[in-house]
């Protein structure tokens, strides 16, 4: 694993059950909100913060990829669109 956050995600996924408070930062953006924002600011073609299973775009960075460690400009130019970001946050 590349960092403690990614390791914690794997451990959480491997548990047979969990409490909602344990996955507070893993909720995905609701589809209606995503499509509304996409209509105003898109087209979104790159999801910056996903666990791989909750991606809103076909192209994405996972927590292990760490979108903040990359320059997205070339990838966005290739994909011809904008980046969508709803980062995980603890609650």
Curated annotation (Swiss-Prot):
Transmembrane segments: none annotated. It comes from the Bacteria. The keyword Methyltransferase applies. One of its GO terms (biological process) is viral process. The keyword Methyltransferase applies. Signal peptide: none annotated. Keywords: Methyltransferase, Transferase. Coiled coil: none annotated. One of its GO terms (molecular function) is site-specific DNA-methyltransferase (adenine-specific) activity. InterPro entries: Dam_MeTrfase. Its EC number is 2.1.1.-. It is an enzyme of class 2 (transferase). Pfam families: Dam (PF05869). Encoded by the CPS-53 (KpLE1) prophage. May be missing up to 130 C-terminal residues compared to orthologs. NCBIfam families: phage_N6A_met. This is Putative methyltransferase YfdM. It comes from Escherichia coli (strain K12). The lineage of its organism: Bacteria, Pseudomonadati, Pseudomonadota, Gammaproteobacteria, Enterobacterales. The gene is yfdM.
């Amino acid at each position: 694993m590349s960092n403690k956050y990614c390791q914690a995600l794997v451990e959480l996924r491997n548990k047979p059950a969990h409490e909602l408070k344990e996955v507070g930062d893993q909720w995905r953006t609701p589809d209606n909100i995503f499509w509304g924002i996409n209509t105003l600011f898109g087209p979104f073609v790159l999801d910056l913060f996903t666990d791989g299973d909750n991606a809103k775009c076909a192209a994405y960075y996972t927590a292990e990829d760490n979108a903040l460690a990359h320059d997205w400009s070339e990838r966005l130019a290739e994909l011809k669109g904008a980046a969508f970001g709803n980062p995980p946050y603890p609650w």
